Amino acid sequence: MKKPQRSLRFASLTAMLVLLVPLTAVFAASAQQDFGTPDEAAHALIEAAGANDNDAMAAILGKDSAEIEQKGSDPGIAATRDRFVDAANKVLLIQESSPDSAWLIIGPDAFVYPVPLVRKGERWSFDSVAGAEELTNRRIGLNELMTMTVLEELPLLQREYEEVPRDGSNVRAYAQRFLSTSGKHDGLYWDAAQGEPQSPLGPMLKDVDTKAATSYYGYTYRMLTSQGAAAPGGAYDYMINGNLIGGFAALAVPVHYGKTGVMSFIVNRYGVVYQKDLGEKSDEVAKVIASYNPDSTWSLAREEIAKDSPTLP
């Protein structure tokens, strides 16, 4: 099926995040609602999104209910449908790529909705099969970009954390965790009490239910407390007398390989992110990674993006 000739580079991260969140799961074959015209289908979708009506969205898009339910625990998957509706209310165009297919163009940035409309007989419906792969590819790209951005911010977050001793200690050290243990300030994020200073990760996670969340934009994160021979300065431990003083590093791994991400990422205090495809068992492989060690099997993440110069339809 011919797609409209519209290049949408990864740089348009914010706009893409806003518009992709109403479609966050793999599509499944289920009974779908059809419509007399593409315009009728488009407005039904917008109305369902505006009402945050999961049943209506499932009927229109053909998702099964089990896939829709996954939206609650991950802020990257959570449905911020009000923003989607706002963008569609500003700009909604229907571009017919053939007599039997059409695409929705949404928002001021002319975002091409990933699920096309197709005509069967005299009725139109969203082609969820055609949209599934495109949606997955876009979601993976966005999740990976967001993960790289978080890791690039890690040096600033850790320096902010290290400015003062924490939890009654007289030692200034880096955080050993991303999320603090309940009742402690041993991580980059904690629930700030009334009048208490916000945690370094507070601004980034202000709209996230950190008690329910198990990942962030499809990735899990873990601090690394040592580095290997391939790291600048060679192998050594960052821990001194139980405190993370000699440096810091982190590892990020996709929750579901091939669905929420493909590449795994590492970073240290210099903020340069490296990537590697750990394969379908990324989560198991990652469990044995104890040190920051960007050897020749890892590549610079941003360099790969520049080289590939990816575009989205």
Predicted regions mapped to residue ranges:
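N-terminal secretory signal peptides that target proteins for export/translocation
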Residues: 1-9
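Bacterial N-terminal signal peptides
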Residues: 11-25
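Short, low-complexity N-terminal intrinsically disordered segments enriched in polar/charged residues
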Residues: 27-47, 131-156, 160
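Short, well-ordered alpha-helical segments enriched in acidic and aromatic residues
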Residues: 53-65, 171-173, 178
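Surface-exposed, charged secondary-structure patches
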Residues: 65-113, 210-217, 222, 227-230, ...
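Short beta-strand edge/turn micro-motifs at domain boundaries
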Residues: 102-105, 109-145, 152, 272-276
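Flexible, glycine-rich surface segments
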Residues: 161-261
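C-terminal soluble interaction/assembly domains
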Residues: 246-300, 311-312
